Amino acid sequence: MGRVIRAQRKGAGSVFKAHVKHRKGAAKLRHIDFAERHGYIKGIVKDIIHDPGRGTPLAKVVFRDPYRFKKRTELFIAAEGIHTGQFVFCGKKAQLNIGNVLPVGVMPEGTIICCLEEKPGDRGKLARASGNYATVISHNPETKKSRVKLPSGAKKVISSTNRAVVGVVAGGGRIDKPILKAGRAYHKYKVKRNCWPRVRGVAMNPVEHPFGGGNHQHIGKPSTIRRDVPAGRKVGLIAARRTGRLRGTKTVQEKEN
């Protein structure tokens, strides 16, 4: 019998978990409160920091607690163009400026946003990667819903009370620079997770992978595989509808609903 293959080992356990030792913390919007629902609250950007394992810079924003005599520090996804010492306003009546946090329903159509809430109060789930942004498409005041275009190009209908940061996520163009050497890839994935270097299946022995073995490196069987095979055999092109090159030209018309 063969060994437990890599795809099976990627489950419970510490081997493939993210390396979170030096992370700075979870980057989220403020908890929704009375000040944000009915007016605005002012904070100041104290620092812009790097978070290991994340390509996006983070902004340390300090707010006065509206209910206690103390200050609270929040970690925001930094929007491109913000700077230390800048005032950040969060709330329904805040101005539409870069870095401010507003409900989607009060933004004009065509506004560029990031760190968008998927559900009201979840503190930002969509368009958070470096250089990403979503676009406000339309509003429906009757149903209190808004339509946004996500970085993937998909369009999503969300509640108009969902909050978002105005602007584009900082750190855009990060992946344009080539890695060039293995040492940089080593350090990149050292702070992310144990997924590098990745050995090819055909380079393994037969006990370690279904594609392993042979006098030369070849798969030796169809690389397509059905959906319901056991986990130790499920490698290659899983339940592929088609394989090979996409030949010819095909025009796709985007439907506007």
Swiss-Prot record:
What is its subcellular localisation?
A: Cytoplasm
Gene3D superfamilies for this protein: 2.30.30.30, Nucleic acid-binding proteins, Ribosomal protein L2, domain 3
The answer on whether this UniProt entry bears the keyword Ribosomal protein reads yes
Q: What is its main location?
A: cytoplasm
Keywords (alphabetical) are: Cytoplasm, Ribonucleoprotein, Ribosomal protein, RNA-binding, rRNA-binding
MF GO annotations: rRNA binding; structural constituent of ribosome
The record's region (Disordered) falls at 207-226
One Gene Ontology cellular component annotation held by this UniProt entry: cytosolic large ribosomal subunit
State the Gene Ontology BP annotations: cytoplasmic translation
A Pfam family recorded for this sequence: Ribosomal_L2_C
The record's comment on protein family reads: Belongs to the universal ribosomal protein uL2 family.
Q: Main role?
A: Component of the large ribosomal subunit. The ribosome is a large ribonucleoprotein complex responsible for the synthesis of proteins in the cell.
How does this polypeptide assemble, per the annotation?
Component of the large ribosomal subunit.
Q: Which PANTHER family match?
A: LARGE RIBOSOMAL SUBUNIT PROTEIN UL2 (PTHR13691:SF16), RIBOSOMAL PROTEIN L2 (PTHR13691)
Please state what the protein is called.
Large ribosomal subunit protein uL2
